């Protein structure tokens, strides 16, 4: 997953470079041995490494069992495909992970303007780990997409904007990728398949710089106006477009870099799922990796409303009271 090189001073005063490797092993992708069927009773864990050509001394730092809230979305995002479940080969070409400021120091930098959360103790203040969820694809076929999802429960009716930082880079299997080779896909809805809003934003390749703006280029920042989400449903209904098909707006501002679509009847008052994905826009299989960070709502509408009770006594000449 990651590699870090450090300079170590030996006892004789010489300096030697040492490499540290971080591995993440997907537990549920293993091969059952001797009839084990589940993870309900795990008593021992053994780790071994093989295929070394010479004696090697390894220093083992820590072994952690970790989990995440994001899950791989095992269905296709292509609305034209009837068989929506991905097959075994398609499930092998993408994975979900995480990069953080503590475990990936040097290769990871927090987004501009974002500060690490502080845990206030009785005598000390501890900085929390700042991290991003990652989606990596390997030889993703042309015009195909892969995604991850998370279950939520939020109401965005009182907010004006939806924002997020994104980072695109080639992974270890990619020779090179270019700007707009990948698009980010963000879906928010009441369910994963039939009622959702979709945003698609072409991504620029992040540079190899060391500043936050290099790692998180402004062109990749999502800045969506939530008021247009309701407007696109009205636009679709006026055209008598089927609500069971994905409708893409044709009347949005041309200066807006993202494309907004809707399917079904989602509502910002009850969002239950978020889908984050990446789509191959080229005509050939390519590999890449996207980091998603700080998906957030902004611009809270705090304007008060009006309420009144009226009691009137009117006299209309000699006709009525």
Where in this protein do the model-derived segments appear?
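Extracellular/surface-associated beta-sandwich interaction domains
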Residues: 1-321
């Amino acid at each position: 997953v990651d590699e870090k090189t450090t300079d170590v001073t030996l006892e004789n005063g010489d300096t030697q470079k040492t490499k540290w490797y971080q591995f993440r092993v997907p537990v549920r992708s293993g091969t059952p041995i001797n009839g084990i069927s589940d993870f309900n009773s795990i008593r021992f864990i053994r780790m071994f490494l093989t295929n070394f050509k010479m004696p090697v001394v390894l220093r083992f730092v820590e072994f952690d069992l970790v989990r995440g809230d994001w899950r791989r979305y095992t269905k296709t995002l292509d609305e034209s495909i009837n068989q929506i479940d991905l097959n075994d080969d398609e499930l092998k070409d993408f994975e979900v992970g995480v990069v953080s400021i503590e475990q990936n120091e040097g290769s990871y930098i927090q987004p501009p303007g974002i500060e690490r959360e502080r845990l206030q103790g009785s005598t000390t203040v501890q900085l929390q780990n700042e991290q991003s969820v990652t989606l990596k694809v390997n030889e993703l076929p042309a015009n195909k997409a892969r995604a991850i999802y998370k279950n939520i429960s939020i109401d965005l009716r009182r907010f004006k904007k939806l924002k997020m930082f994104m980072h695109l880079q080639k992974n270890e299997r990619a020779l090179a990728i270019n700007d707009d080779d990948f698009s980010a896909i963000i879906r928010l809805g009441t369910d994963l398949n039939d009622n959702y809003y979709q945003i698609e934003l072409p991504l620029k390749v992040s540079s190899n710089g060391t500043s936050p703006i290099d790692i998180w280029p402004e062109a990749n920042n999502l800045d969506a106006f939530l008021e247009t989400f309701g407007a696109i449903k009205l636009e679709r209904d006026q055209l008598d477009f089927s609500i069971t098909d994905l409708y893409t707006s044709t009347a949005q501002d041309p200066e807006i870099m993202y494309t907004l679509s809707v399917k079904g009847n989602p509502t910002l008052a009850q969002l239950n799922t978020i889908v984050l994905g990446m789509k191959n826009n080229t005509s050939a299989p390519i590999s890449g990796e996207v980091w998603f960070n700080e998906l957030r709502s902004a611009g809270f509408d705090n304007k008060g409303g009006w309420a009144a009770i009226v009691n009137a006594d009117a006299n209309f000449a000699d006709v009525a009271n």
